[in-house]
């Protein structure tokens, strides 16, 4: 099976234009990517572009800092779903994790899960900022709150996915949740490493290049 069906084809830079989104969606259709992952303000355009096609629309929430109130996250999630988002990638409040304030962490996740309705929710942990114990507890919090996936990174922190973090996340959630690896995944070998570690979804802005790399093997 091609890796395309596992890839969230991602474009989250602040200077993204409507034409960039149209190109992203066309690439997703042409190559069979799982989703396009875009900012909330671009969800409606992406949903219109992908109407009648297989790739789904994923929106980030509380991105990239995670320093957002629960009610703001909920409102942002509802707006994204109303605009056509099928999947939601939310960022946890890393500062709350560091404060050992798990009530806030879980309140944020629950607010998004409740607002998302039937949409898939992925919880971004920002693993580069967390200890192994914090990664484990964050995964457990995501599962308790009803999330569907845990995800490594925003791509805006010190580093992205590592095989060690993905493996720890997989051991923690078992087969009950999906694991999405993202951040710094640029080659087919990177993808293979993450899949072996336990990832079931890949987030990448270099999706097309990954397929070219796959074909060259």
From Swiss-Prot:
Catalyzed chemical reaction(s): 2-deoxy-D-ribose 5-phosphate = D-glyceraldehyde 3-phosphate + acetaldehyde
Catalytic residue list: 89 (proton donor/acceptor), 151 (schiff-base intermediate with acetaldehyde), 180 (proton donor/acceptor)
Keyword list, A-Z: Cytoplasm, Lyase, Schiff base
UniProt keyword Cytoplasm, yes or no: yes
Gene: deoC1
Protein name per its UniProtKB record: Deoxyribose-phosphate aldolase 1
Main localization (coarse): cytoplasm
Record pathway: Carbohydrate degradation; 2-deoxy-D-ribose 1-phosphate degradation; D-glyceraldehyde 3-phosphate and acetaldehyde from 2-deoxy-alpha-D-ribose 1-phosphate: step 2/2
Assigned protein family: Belongs to the DeoC/FbaB aldolase family. DeoC type 1 subfamily.
Subcellular location: Cytoplasm
GO terms for cellular component: cytoplasm
Taxonomic source organism: Cutibacterium acnes (strain DSM 16379 / KPA171202)
């Amino acid at each position: 099976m091609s890796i395309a069906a596992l890839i969230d084809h991602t474009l989250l830079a602040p200077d993204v234009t409507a034409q960039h989104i149209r190109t992203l969606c066309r690439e997703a259709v042409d190559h069979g990517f799982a989703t396009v992952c875009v900012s909330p303000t671009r969800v409606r355009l992406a949903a219109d572009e992908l109407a009648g096609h297989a790739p789904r629309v994923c929106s980030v929430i509380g991105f990239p800092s995670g320093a957002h109130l629960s009610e703001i996250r909920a409102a942002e999630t509802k707006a994204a779903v109303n605009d056509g988002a099928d999947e939601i990638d939310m960022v946890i409040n890393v500062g709350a994790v560091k404060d050992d304030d798990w009530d806030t962490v879980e309140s944020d996740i629950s607010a998004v899960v409740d607002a998302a309705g039937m949409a898939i929710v992925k919880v971004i942990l920002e693993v580069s900022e967390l200890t192994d114990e914090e990664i484990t507890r964050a995964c457990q919090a995501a599962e308790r709150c009803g999330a569907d996936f845990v995800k490594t990174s925003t791509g805006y922190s010190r580093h992205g996915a590592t095989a060690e973090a993905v493996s720890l996340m997989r051991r923690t959630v078992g087969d009950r949740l999906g694991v999405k690896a993202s951040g710094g995944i640029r080659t087919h070998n990177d993808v293979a490493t993450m899949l072996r570690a336990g990832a079931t979804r890949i987030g990448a802005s270099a999706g097309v290049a990954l397929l070219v790399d796959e074909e060259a093997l």
